[in-house]
Each structure stands twice: as C-alpha cells, then as structure tokens.
Amino acid sequence: MQVPGSYGNYVKMQSAVSATGDGTSLACFDVSFGYFNFATMQVTGITTATITFEANIDGTNWVAILVKNLNTGVEATTTTADGLFRVQCTGLMNIRARISSWSSGATTVTGIATS
C-alpha cells in the first residue's frame, strides 16, 4: 500500500500534438507500489480540439470516464478548454486523454497519478 506523497507516476500524455490521436496512457497501477488513488491532468494549448478522457482495466478496451474540472467543478467525459482535471483511478489500469477531434492548435496533456 502506498504512503501519501511517497511516489507518483508522471507522464506526458500528449506533447504539442497537432492532430487526432490516442497519445500515451497514464498507468494507475504500479507493481511495486500498488494502485494510485487519483490522476490529475493538465491540458494546455487547446484552440479547436476535443479531448476525450478514457480508461481501461484490461489494457485494450477503452471506455469514456467522467473527470472533474478543478476550475469549474463540472464533471464531463470531454473538454474543449485548457484546465486541470482529476479522476479517482483506484481500480483502473490506465487512463488516456485522446484527442478525438482537431482543427488547429498544439495540445499538450500532462498527467500524474498519486496516492
């Protein structure tokens, strides 16, 4: 079991991307440390793009998940604006921020899973 503040999993999920794409997933489970409790993602650079937040437990089949916008408090499965987003990830294996539509801009998503 993790001790709060002892370890975090940091991933650049999308890096100045100018197209649709799956990006890199953020692992919510570490063999040495167990499950992380929360994942927080920072989205920057959106101009005309949509990010769909998704997760899986089998490493293959992705399902849209609700994330909380930490600025507005609103929960949604997508965003079209920059911001900080959080989701409880206990029990999930991976989370991704898929760019599901894109017209312009260079979108970056950075994620960290922590206990």
Q: For each of these PLM feature ranges, what is it?
A:
Residues 1-35:
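Transition segment at domain starts
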Residues 43-51, 102-107:
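Extended, low-complexity, turn-rich repeat/linker tracts enriched in Gly/Pro/Ser/Thr and Asp/Glu
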Residues 27-34, 68-115:
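Beta-sandwich interaction modules
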Residues 10, 58-69, 73-75:
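Tryptophan-centered short beta-strand motifs
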